């Protein structure tokens, strides 16, 4: 069985036992999180939401809270000797999908 969930403005296809790297979610390591924005549930019987599947949810456990690798943003103006270098590290959460409720 698999499901398509929406979190952090992105869509992910998940099944039970998968590890999922998403935008930061509130909670500590070991807490359970319920993702209620389920767009589709597949398996023996397919259910497609319009836009969401009613009474469907995905339960996951927070495995890790942290930051991604640093992304360097370099901006320059040609012929002006004007340069700017910024760095950014996005906060992220790693979930282990435990159960898909359909």
Swiss-Prot record:
One of its GO terms (molecular function) is rRNA binding. One of its GO terms (cellular component) is ribosome. Transmembrane segments: none annotated. Keywords: Ribonucleoprotein, Ribosomal protein, RNA-binding, rRNA-binding. GO terms for biological process: translation. The keyword Phosphoprotein does not apply. Belongs to the bacterial ribosomal protein bL21 family. This protein binds to 23S rRNA in the presence of protein L20. Part of the 50S ribosomal subunit. Contacts protein L20. HAMAP family: Ribosomal_bL21. This is Large ribosomal subunit protein bL21. It comes from Geotalea uraniireducens (strain Rf4).
